[in-house]
Amino acid sequence: MVKLAFPRELRLLTPSHFTFVFQQPQRAGTPQITILGRLNELGHPRIGLTVAKKHVKRAHERNRIKRLTRESFRLHQHALPSMDFVVLVKKGVADLDNRALTEALEKLWRRHCRQAPAS
């Protein structure tokens, strides 16, 4: 049985982790969301989230976006390549309902799976 937990090891925690991804990212995006990815040597994917107050004014909206993004990652973690991902949100993401946001994330995860070099 596959575990679908979201432990600390699956998160980007320090600024150096984020900088690593920003240096040479593979990009996949929609008008509202961009997911940057870079291969890691850990054998499992990790995720970091950036939801700027500039783009999403209200805290409860930022929290909803982060919660749905973490849940999408948690459910897809075993299908994803061993990459570090940074999810960047843009203006207009707060206007997406939960279903549209989840579908956009699934589309971007599939795109990263196709772009990743076979290992």
Curated annotation (Swiss-Prot):
Its EC number is 3.1.26.5. NCBIfam families: rnpA. Keywords: Endonuclease, Hydrolase, Nuclease, RNA-binding, tRNA processing. It comes from Yersinia pestis. This is Ribonuclease P protein component. Consists of a catalytic RNA component (M1 or rnpB) and a protein subunit. RNaseP catalyzes the removal of the 5'-leader sequence from pre-tRNA to produce the mature 5'-terminus. It can also cleave other RNA substrates such as 4.5S RNA. The protein component plays an auxiliary but essential role in vivo by binding to the 5'-leader sequence and broadening the substrate specificity of the ribozyme. GO terms for cellular component: ribonuclease P complex.
